[in-house]
């Protein structure tokens, strides 16, 4: 009889939890939409940013939240596009991954600095020997991407990282590269990217099948450090900033924005002033360094079929000439 009553009690507790999650749409960590809204309100500035004319939404929250991601997708039209530009046919993958993340905050709740001045640090070889590290570290927000290292390159690129965009094939797997003060942002290009994150968060086994190169097989970041980028940011980069066609000819591979352009688009939505470093490439010398680290050369960039580097360089030239951004490595 005692066991029977215990079973009824446990069932009631479980049912209460399920109903609570449904009614309040919380994630696994019990965060409600109202609490999310309070946390993620970006402090507005009295003046408009220089790049304001590029933005359709001036109070857009760039990270997905478990509590309301479906409503967000519907409101911004992301339910009509497949990845990497929307959530169509991938909502289940988003839900599973998001429910394992404790929050979707942009900045720390105690961060009261308004009108943030940001720098987006590319991985370009032009950063070699520039000694911009101290300058980069002086910004309110420092955005980096992929596996561009800080360790061993502090003089060139600084020590601090606020945000780092990544995808499964580009994320660090060496714990020496983990800064507990960094927020890492998954930029999902395919449903498998979300499945990869969910598997790592739940202790599952990762299969390399379906990735263009082997993804990280372990996660050096804690769940509280991880966010998932709203696909609207990638879609805006592709269609509104780079003006890519929605349908490519059959004889062409579809082009997608590089992580660098996506990072700049993110900066436009969370910063008041945006500076760039490391986005200039030397196409006249294919043997020149592609990155400020490693031995890769510009020849690899010229062989890339998935990005339109010419369109990206024209876009960068345009926003620099219009003083929408400042380029720290302009020569």
From Swiss-Prot:
Enzyme class: transferase
Organism, scientific name: Bos taurus
Sugar attachment sites: 129, 181, 282, 295, 308
Residue numbers on the Cytoplasmic membrane side: 1-4
Lumenal side: 26-331
GO cellular component assignments: Golgi membrane
Gene label: ST3GAL6
Cited PANTHER family: SIALYLTRANSFERASE (PTHR13713), TYPE 2 LACTOSAMINE ALPHA-2,3-SIALYLTRANSFERASE (PTHR13713:SF8)
Residue spans crossing the bilayer: 5-25
Reported function: Transfers the sialyl residue from CMP-N-acetyl-beta-neuraminate to the terminal galactose residue on sugar chains of glycoproteins and glycolipids. It's alpha-2,3-sialyltransferase activity is specific toward type II glycan chains (Galbeta1-4GlcNAc) on glycoproteins and glycolipids such as neolactosides nLc4Cer and nLc6Cer, whose sialyl-products serve as precursors for the Lewis X antigen. Critically involved in the synthesis of functional selectin ligands needed for neutrophil recruitment during inflammation and lymphocyte homing to the lymph nodes.
Keyword list, A-Z: Glycoprotein, Glycosyltransferase, Golgi apparatus, Membrane, Signal-anchor, Transferase, Transmembrane, Transmembrane helix
Protein name, entry field: Type 2 lactosamine alpha-2,3-sialyltransferase
């Amino acid at each position: 009889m005692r066991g029977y009553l215990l079973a009824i009690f446990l069932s009631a507790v479980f049912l209460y939890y399920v109903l609570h999650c449904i009614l309040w749409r919380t994630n696994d960590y019990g965060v409600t939409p109202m609490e999310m809204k309070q946390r993620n309100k970006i402090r507005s500035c009295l003046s408009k940013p220089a790049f304001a004319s590029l933005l359709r939404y001036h109070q857009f929250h760039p990270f997905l939240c478990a509590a309301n991601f479906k409503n967000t997708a519907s409101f911004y039209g992301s339910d009509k596009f497949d990845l990497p530009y929307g959530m169509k046919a991938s909502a289940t993958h988003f839900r599973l991954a998001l429910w394992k993340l404790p929050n979707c905050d942009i900045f720390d709740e105690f961060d009261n600095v308004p009108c943030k001045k940001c720098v987006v640090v590319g991985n370009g070889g032009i950063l070699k020997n520039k000694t911009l590290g101290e300058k980069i570290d002086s910004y309110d927000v420092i955005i980096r991407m992929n596996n561009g290292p800080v360790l061993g390159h502090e003089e060139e690129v600084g020590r601090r990282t606020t945000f780092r965009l990544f995808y499964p094939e580009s994320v660090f797997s060496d714990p020496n590269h983990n800064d507990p003060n960094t927020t890492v942002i998954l930029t999902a290009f395919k449903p498998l990217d979300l499945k990869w994150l969910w598997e790592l968060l739940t202790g599952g086994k990762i299969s390399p099948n379906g990735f263009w190169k082997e993804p990280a097989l372990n996660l050096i970041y804690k769940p509280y450090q991880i966010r998932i980028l709203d696909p609207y940011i990638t879609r805006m980069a592709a269609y509104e900033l780079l003006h890519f066609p929605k349908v490519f000819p059959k004889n062409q591979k579809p082009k997608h924005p590089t992580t660098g352009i996506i990072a700049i688009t993110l900066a436009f939505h969370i910063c008041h002033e945006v500076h760039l470093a490391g986005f200039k490439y030397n196409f006249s010398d294919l043997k020149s360094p592609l990155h400020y680290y490693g031995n890769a050369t510009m020849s690899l960039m010229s062989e890339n079929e998935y990005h339109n580097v010419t369109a990206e360089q024209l876009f960068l030239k345009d926003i620099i000439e219009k003083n929408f951004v400042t380029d720290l490595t302009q020569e």
